[in-house]
Design a protein with these regions (language model features):
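Second-shell loop/turn segments in exported
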Residues: 6-16, 70-74, 85, 105-111, ...
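Noncatalytic luminal/extracellular "stalk/propeptide" segments of secretory-pathway proteins
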Residues: 2-103, 110
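Active-site-adjacent substrate-binding region
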Residues: 201, 302-421, 483-512, 516
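C-terminal non-catalytic alpha-helical accessory regions
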Residues: 393, 397-568
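Extracellular/luminal Protease-associated
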Residues: 63-160, 165, 331-332
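Catalytic-core environment of secreted peptidases
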Residues: 1-13, 27-33, 88-91, 98, ...
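Soluble metallo-hydrolase cores and metallopeptidase-like ectodomains found primarily
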Residues: 64-96, 155-233, 244-257, 281
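Acidic/histidine-rich catalytic neighborhood of metal-dependent amide-processing enzymes
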Residues: 112-114, 202, 226-315, 339, ...
Length: 568
């Protein structure tokens, strides 16, 4: 931690320190006996600079600001306009109001992420964005951040349709709250100049691998690039954890049924997941055939956290919660369904994901405007004292427990009844007003899939018990079950967690991503839309999405039937 934060600060993708960090990660892995390699690729990254901002009416006030990454630069004379407070910046904040021609004021919570706040502001006709920091009301830290919605490097299509289109700046919470109070008294006009260089640069990721007894493997990773400053929690701490896990697992390589791939990504902060998406794209065949799970480690052991927070695809939930209970005992813990944030570039591929770390209490979050990553997040205040090194030891033990079971279990520790239940619950929730789409048939297939999942889970439990009682048991059945579980995840994860599906990436923070089966997100709107062109086009889209759901659930039921038939 000290080495990274003091000798390689400001690890921006495309910078010399970004390259040095990639080389340091490779050297640390090599020293631990792990084969490592640095890969270089072109990345569309951003080098934002300090912005200039002031209130011009009703009084003139200068405000310290940072240009946000991938902001559109303003012209030399800047941008001025009337300010409108849109709070979280989500769609519902605009209801009954017009942002056309105005500059929006929003606050940093990740509901939605900055990237989505910008996208929504543009859709609503705004001309620019001012985003205030989170934290306690006295927080004077001026945040960095990115507003590029395109996940990874753009394609010709997404470059035209998903890149940021507005100039955006970040300001301290103290300044944002002052603007909010001024708006309560009447109109406020602001001016700002956004200064940024956006362009293609060579960027680097580091990948290390410990081979197991079979061709299958688990991926553990996190981003190694950072904003200016030490950025201790984000993500020097995560990188240090992966290095230590690699060192320990390398000493146990002869016991690993599955290998361990260690990924140190880049372009997370200033390129929106360039490194991890490149890795998935360029290792697709091997990942699709042999990757069993992805553990993301990003911002572990923030100072002041006391609970345990885990987010996963639900097929992993039972196994990782059991590991957490063994290691953490009575420490409060909670779970949420994994959504596509951080380096969740494996969703389209269909590899289930787990991310977990310490969390603040609800009371602490209320006091800090939902600063779940610390008031210092994305600022130069992110120094090494923002880490709880005692809690870090618990993090390492939990991560090791996750990886050990994933790498050594004879039968993968997945269960699919919970997956089926999520589909059933969501489809039932969406059914009112969805008659035109034929959702009943898809819901019926979800119930049939659940019955098949019950049979699969029972069979897997039976075989786990057999293998536990005899180390000499033939593992043919395990191979058949594991192959089925991987194929199920390949089909179910993209359906449950993406709108675009397997071969594209939804924009970062995309609002439908917060829901189960994002492709059906607009079903409630269909019932409220009058007959006419808009409704007919939306209905066409949703019928096709419904067909995708029905087909995947039916295909998964058939996979299970075929697997159980083979086992019998």
């Amino acid at each position: 931690m000290e080495r990274i934060t003091t000798t390689i600060p400001s690890r921006l993708a495309g910078s010399e320190n970004g390259r040095r960090m990639a080389e340091y990660s490779a050297a640390a892995l090599t020293k631990a006996g792990v084969a490592a390699r640095v890969f270089e690729m072109p990345g569309l990254v951003s080098f934002p600079e300090p912005a200039e901002m002031r209130v011009v009416a009703p009084v003139e006030i200068a405000i310290e600001a940072n240009t946000l990454g991938h902001s559109v630069p303003t012209l030399a004379d800047g941008l001025s306009g009337e300010l409108i407070d849109v709070a979280s910046g989500a769609f519902h904040e605009y209801e009954g109001r017009s942002a056309v021609g105005k500059i929006t004021l929003s606050e940093l919570s990740y509901h939605p992420a900055r990237h989505e706040k910008q996208r929504i502001s543009a859709l609503m006709g705004a001309t620019g964005c001012v985003m205030m920091n989170w934290g306690h009301p006295e927080n004077t830290a001026v945040p960095f951040g990115s507003v590029k919605p395109v996940w990874g490097n753009p394609t010709p299509e997404t470059y035209k349709t998903e890149m940021a289109t507005l100039p955006c700046v970040g300001i301290a919470r103290t300044a944002g709250l002052k603007l909010r109070e001024m708006l309560k008294a009447g109109p406020v006009r602001v001016w700002f100049r956004a200064n940024v260089e956006n362009g293609w640069r060579p960027v680097q990721i580091t990948v290390g691998e410990i081979e197991g007894q079979t061709s299958d493997f688990v991926v553990v990773g996190g981003h190694q690039d950072s904003w200016p400053g030490p950025q201790a929690t984000d993500n020097a701490a995560g990188n240090a954890c992966v290095m230590e896990l690699a060192r320990v697992f390398a000493q146990c390589r002869d016991k690993l049924r599955r290998g361990l791939v260690c990924g140190f990504w880049t372009g997370h902060e200033t390129g929106t997941m360039i490194g991890s998406s490149w890795y998935v794209d360029h290792n697709w065949d091997r990942l699709r055939e042999h990757a069993v799970a992805y553990l993301q480690i990003d911002q572990p052991a923030c100072a002041g956290t006391s609970r345990w927070s885990a987010a996963s695809n639900v097929e992993l939930k039972r196994f990782h919660q059991a590991a957490e209970k063994r290691v953490l005992g009575a420490r409060p813990a909670f779970w949420r369904r994994a959504v596509k944030n951080g380096d969740a570039s494996f969703f389209g591929l269909g590899v289930p994901m787990l991310a977990a770390q310490g969390a603040f209490t609800e009371d602490e979050l209320k006091k800090t405007a939902l600063a779940n990553l610390g008031w210092w997040h994305h600022s130069v205040e992110n120094t090494i004292d923002k880490l709880d090194f005692a809690f870090m030891q618990d993090h390492l033990r939990v991560y090791a427990a996750y990886l050990w079971e994933l790498c050594t279990a004879v039968v993968l520790p997945f269960e699919f009844v919970s997956v089926a239940d999520q589909f059933i619950e969501r489809l039932e929730e969406l059914k009112p007003g969805a008659e035109a789409v034929g959702l009943d048939g898809a819901a019926g297939r979800a119930r049939v899939f659940r019955a098949a999942a019950e049979r699969l889970d029972r069979s897997a439990e039976d075989w786990r018990a057999r293998y536990a009682s005899s180390s000499a048991a033939d593992e043919t059945a395990a191979e058949i079950l594991n192959a089925c579980m991987k194929r199920l995840s390949r089909a179910l994860v993209p359906l449950a967690s993406t709108a675009k599906g397997a071969y594209g990436h939804d924009p970062y923070g995309y609002t439908p991503q917060g829901t189960m089966i994002p492709s059906l997100y607009d079903l409630p709107r269909l019932a409220k839309t009058a007959e006419g062109e808009e409704r007919w086009m939306l209905e066409t889209q949703l019928v096709r999405a419904r067909n995708r759901v029905a087909d995947v659930l039916d295909d998964c039921r058939r996979m299970i039937d075929d697997t159980l038939r083979t086992l019998s």
